[in-house]
């Protein structure tokens, strides 16, 4: 499991919020922000999430489950927990889901993954760690009848994929030249499709072969995640100006696990 930590010293405007919130400075930490389970069907696994209050006042933290989907560009969209086919909301328990911490105090949150005997496929979701501020009813926004204001959050991504599931498979199609971010260099777009049932952590890169001299070059890779049943649209830029001639340009995807490198190829003429 890769562990990352995120620390907020001031109020952040979180893109996942759908409501305008009041602005209070916050200072808290959540670690890790990426949690990966590999429980086989019928197994239970537990991992620990740490929430630490770095502010100088007592704060309340709420942990809420949510689903997310991804666009072809890789943008995540937050969905209601349990609303998607790949949701793990029914498999995961967050205990406790509410904590109140003094300054510099931390809490350990148990994330318990209970995989049913039929749970062979990969699933994912998120935990939104939010800070709640209480106000007197007379001071609260009229639309917030509870008198509790939710301020921006830290998002923890959670993934579950059985160890027994080794279905890594993907394709590269639709290679074409497009207008890229830098008009001085030529850019190329391809569609990466995950046709398996594991999240592909892939390296994608361009390779150029001169058809006259047989000279080949590979260029620096870019990291891309492709979820099961997802397509990702990726644009790569050729970082140099090749000399005149005929070339074979390949758009390649290497997702490891002893699988063959996938790719698509087009002919390129440079005058």
Predicted regions and their residues:
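Bacterial N-terminal signal peptides
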Residues: 10-20
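Terminal connector regions
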Residues: 61-69, 114-160, 242-271
